[in-house]
Amino acid sequence: MHYLYLFISIATEIIGTSFLKTSEGFTKLWPTLGTLLSFGICFYFLSLTIKFLPLNITYATWAGLGLVLTTIISVIVFKENVNLISIISIGLIVIGVVLLNVFGESH
């Protein structure tokens, strides 16, 4: 169940970040409200996750996968560019998250 909470937290963080981009500095009402609601849900489920999983693994997974998926969305939806160094760096983040989850401290 705790990995479901983490997944919901990551998904709503990505949604919130996408709304943040479209809010244009909090000048657009609906994207601003979407940002606030999404991040509220995100941090609620993140707080539930850290009740069950170690903070270091939870945060690394949340931040790492959030960054990777947000980058993918920024390329697909917002037509932003990434270079080779960015792609390699994102690959290293994915490797780090996997290693932490496989070999990191667990309860």
UniProtKB/Swiss-Prot annotation:
Listed under GO biological process in this entry are: glycine betaine transport
Where does this chain mainly localize?
A: membrane
**What the protein does?**
Multidrug exporter. Is implicated for the resistance to bacteriocidal quaternary ammonium compounds.
Localization, UniProt: Cell membrane
**In which domain of life is the source organism classified?**
Bacteria
InterPro entries (UniProt xref): Small_drug/metabolite_transptr (IPR000390), Small_multidrug_res (IPR045324)
The gene that this protein is the product of is: qacG
- An annotated Gene Ontology molecular function: amino-acid betaine transmembrane transporter activity
What's one GO-annotated cellular component? plasma membrane
| Annotated transmembrane regions | 1-21, 26-46, 57-77, 84-104
Does the keyword field hold GTP-binding?
no
UniProt protein name: Quaternary ammonium compound-resistance protein QacG
Give the organism's phylogenetic lineage. Answer: Bacteria, Bacillati, Bacillota, Bacilli, Bacillales
Q: Give UniProt keywords alphabetically.
A: Cell membrane, Membrane, Plasmid, Transmembrane, Transmembrane helix, Transport
By sequence similarity, the record places it as follows: Belongs to the drug/metabolite transporter (DMT) superfamily. Small multidrug resistance (SMR) (TC 2.A.7.1) family.
Topology of this chain in the membrane: Multi-pass membrane protein
* Keyword Protease applies: no
